[in-house]
């Protein structure tokens, strides 16, 4: 093998190793956002739920600040249970990456029967949370709070 070929091969291997350390983008969260919009009939933008209280958004800890934050805590717990399912326990199959089939008809959410066990579980996690968000009051004072002091 020529030295130039070895350099190209080495460059490809290093690139692949670097790409392996880049986390995949959560695909399912887009669907979850659409479910939220369906359930609340578009009354509140999805981004308002991304940094609310102690549990809505990335991570979560402490005591939920209100009922809406409890919806997010329950959703986080549901995703945790999904990750324990054998059907969801393979690469890129967990709750953040697995997409599912559902329908939205005039605010009514239905997870379709063609979902496998993992997708059905995740769909129901998202459906339950979206319905909870729609029926629970939103307190602007709990958006973008200091989680280090309040949670």
Swiss-Prot record:
Signal sequence interval, chain numbering: 1-27
Keywords associated with the record:
Calcium, Disulfide bond, Hydrolase, Lipid degradation, Lipid metabolism, Metal-binding, Secreted, Signal, Toxin
**Domain of life, per lineage:** Eukaryota
InterPro entries with a match to the protein in the record: PLipase_A2, PLipase_A2_Asp_AS, PLipase_A2_dom, PLipase_A2_dom_sf, PLipase_A2_His_AS
Q: Which cysteines link up through disulfide bonds?
A: 38-104, 54-151, 56-72, 71-132, 78-125, 88-118, 111-123
Which GO biological-process labels does this protein carry? arachidonate secretion; fatty acid biosynthetic process; lipid catabolic process; phospholipid metabolic process; positive regulation of fibroblast proliferation
Annotated active site:
75, 126
Reaction catalysis annotation: a 1,2-diacyl-sn-glycero-3-phosphocholine + H2O = a 1-acyl-sn-glycero-3-phosphocholine + a fatty acid + H(+)
For whether the record's keyword set contains ATP-binding, the answer is no
Question: Which Pfam families does this chain map to?
Answer: Phospholip_A2_1
For this chain's record, the cofactor binding note is: Binds 1 Ca(2+) ion.
The record's annotation in Gene3D superfamilies points to:
Phospholipase A2 domain
* GO cellular component terms listed in the entry, alphabetical order: extracellular region
> Which EC numbers characterise this protein's activity in its record?
3.1.1.4
Residues annotated for Ca(2+) binding in this entry: 55, 57, 59, 76
Q: Where in the cell is it found?
A: Secreted
Query: Which tissues carry this protein?
Result: Expressed by the venom gland.
Task: State its role.
Answer: PLA2 catalyzes the calcium-dependent hydrolysis of the 2-acyl groups in 3-sn-phosphoglycerides.
- UniProt xrefs under PANTHER family: PHOSPHOLIPASE A2, PHOSPHOLIPASE A2 FAMILY MEMBER
Protein name as it appears in the record? Acidic phospholipase A2 1
Origin organism is Tropidechis carinatus (Australian rough-scaled snake)
Q: Give the lineage.
A: Eukaryota, Metazoa, Chordata, Craniata, Vertebrata
């Amino acid at each position: 093998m020529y030295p130039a070929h070895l350099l190209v091969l080495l460059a490809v291997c290093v690139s692949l190793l670097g790409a392996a350390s880049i986390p995949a983008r959560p695909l399912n969260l887009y669907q979850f956002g659409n479910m939220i919009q369906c359930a609340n009939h578009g009354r509140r933008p999805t981004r308002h739920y991304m940094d609310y209280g102690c549990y809505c958004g990335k991570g979560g800890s402490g005591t939920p600040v209100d009922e809406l934050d409890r919806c997010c805590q329950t959703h986080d717990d549901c995703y945790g249970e999904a990750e324990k399912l054998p059907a969801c326990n393979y690469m890129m199959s967990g709750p953040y990456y697995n997409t599912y089939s559902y329908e939205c008809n005039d605010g009514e959410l239905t997870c379709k029967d063609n979902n496998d066990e993992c997708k059905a579980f995740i769909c129901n996690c998202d459906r339950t949370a979206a319905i909870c968000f729609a029926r629970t009051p939103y307190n602007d004072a709990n958006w973008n709070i200091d989680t280090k002091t309040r949670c």
